[in-house]
Design a protein with these regions (language model features):
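A short, surface-exposed alpha-helical micro-motif characterized by mixed small hydrophobic
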Residues: 109-111
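Conserved ABC ATPase "signature" region
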Residues: 19-37, 146-147
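A short, proline-enriched helix->beta-strand linker immediately N-terminal to the Walker B motif
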Residues: 61-65
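Short, glycine/charged-rich "phosphate-handling" switch motifs in NTP-dependent
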Residues: 115, 127
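Conserved ABC ATPase signature
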Residues: 42-46, 50
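Hydrophobic anchor residue at the start of the ABC signature
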Residues: 56, 84
Length: 150
């Protein structure tokens, strides 16, 4: 796992020493709720929720301003989904990151989004502040989608 997380550092911070990269990886593991000793285990040894935390660690180790998350809570049980959502919200506040969050799970979107774009057949049919879209959808497709999913 250490090597997976370190990969981006080697490419984007080529002048960082091995020790600096090592410390950054361990710090990032702790930030996503994993223990330092987990750095030396293999991915197949982790649960689905832990693997998702590792994926998040890989993405945030470089402290990006924008993070694109494609279905980050799919295939996780509801309890673990809640933990991952809380982690993402905490990291967003800590690092002032913007998320582009792609999901079919409207409950998760409602919990995370400030701004929503609803797509139908690959095109945006409605967009605006999340509260506005969820409370008063204007487009028939959006209304049907919310009625079916919420």
């Amino acid at each position: 796992v250490h090597e997976l997380i370190e990969e981006g550092l080697k490419i984007h911070l080529p002048n960082a020493t091995r020790e600096e990269r090592y410390e950054r990886v361990l710090e990032t593991l702790l930030e996503v709720g994993l223990e330092e000793e987990m750095a030396f285990r293999f991915p197949h040894e982790f649960s689905g929720g832990q693997r998702q935390r590792i994926a998040i660690a890989r993405a945030i180790v470089l402290k990006p301003k924008l993070l694109i998350l494609d279905e980050p809570t799919s295939a996780l049980d509801v309890t673990i989904q809640g933990q991952i959502i809380k982690l993402l919200l905490d990291l967003q506040k800590k690092y002032a990151m913007t998320y582009m969050f792609i999901s079919h799970d409207l409950r998760v979107v409602r919990a995370l989004a400030d701004y929503v774009a609803v797509m139908q057949h690959g095109r945006i049919v409605e967009a605006g502040p999340a509260r506005e879209i969820f409370n008063s959808p204007r487009q028939p497709y959006t209304r049907r989608l919310f009625a079916a999913a919420l």
